[in-house]
Amino acid sequence: MLHRNKIHESPPMAPSNGTRAMLDSRPNDNLPRGTICIEDLEIGLSRHLRKEVTDRDIELFAEVSTDRNPVHLDDDYARDTIFEGRIAHGMLTAGLISAVIGEQLPGHGTIYMGQSLKFLAPVRPGDVVLAEVTVREIDYPKRRVTLDCRCTVGNTTVLKGEALVLAPSRKFD
């Protein structure tokens, strides 16, 4: 069993190599990955990651989820929709929020209790998504943490919402 220090670091993953991500001065994500226990969380603590959504990501998500809606996969079909082109699955974008929560804040050992999301704009193949999570409320006795969640593409918010999680605690090591 791992002992959780203030932040237990895991080896970093390779950053996204999308060219648009390189144009921005912010790093792909703020490391370390691992666990921040409930005892060490503070209101306003924030983590993020940046990912270019590729055609391959969309195809793999369609395969895993079995959501093969042609608006995600068929250029000709998608051109005739209100989106005027293919878009990524909304839940693929939401999955980036899950990655921040499960890998960084609070990180490993976190249990999802609920999430509400609003999808505000489409994400297209080639878009670079910034997924951000910020601690809004902490119920220390119950180990419950409410997180504000947001995804942006450039200056456009494409997704916003909140998540309720059960954070790991050192006293259960």
What are these regions (language model features)?
Residues 104-127:
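Mid-chain, well-packed structural core segment of small domains
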Residues 2, 7, 11-29, 33-43, ...:
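HotDog/MaoC-like acyl-thioester-processing domains
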Residues 71-73, 83-84, 111-112, 117-118, ...:
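Short, intrinsically disordered/low-complexity patches at protein termini
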Residues 2, 7, 15-110, 172-173:
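Hot-dog-fold acyl-thioester-processing enzymes
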Residues 48-50, 116, 160-164:
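Well-ordered beta-strand positions in beta-sheet-rich domains
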